[in-house]
């Protein structure tokens, strides 16, 4: 069975592909199967992805005050996907905020640029007190 971390990786990848304009309906099931994300974890990944897509505007509004001088459109797509996932989990799940931040940092190390882990940590750490 896939781990929660693998589910988060898949969600970030799906969010990235969605932002890049991929046709997600044909792609989601095949992608998750390829990553061996099945059963409950597949449902969790799809529900999280769909919820983030639906609430993207709300999540971005929560993020904006914590971006300092950075305009949300100037953030890398991978980093923005990780931030949206982190904000979504903080706001809509019961997962401990320290776990969410740690997972986001790990995702940033794996998928983002060199400065991504520090940036993601700073934004989510500042945000956690408000959530």
From Swiss-Prot:
Protein name (Swiss-Prot/TrEMBL): Transcription antitermination protein NusB
SUPFAM superfamilies: NusB-like
Pfam family, one: NusB
Disulphide bridges: none
UniProt family annotation: Belongs to the NusB family.
HAMAP family: NusB
PANTHER family, per the entry: ANTITERMINATION NUSB DOMAIN-CONTAINING PROTEIN (PTHR11078:SF3), N UTILIZATION SUBSTANCE PROTEIN B-RELATED (PTHR11078)
Organism: Campylobacter curvus (strain 525.92)
Top-rank lineage group of the source organism: Bacteria
Gene Ontology CC annotation, any one: cytosol
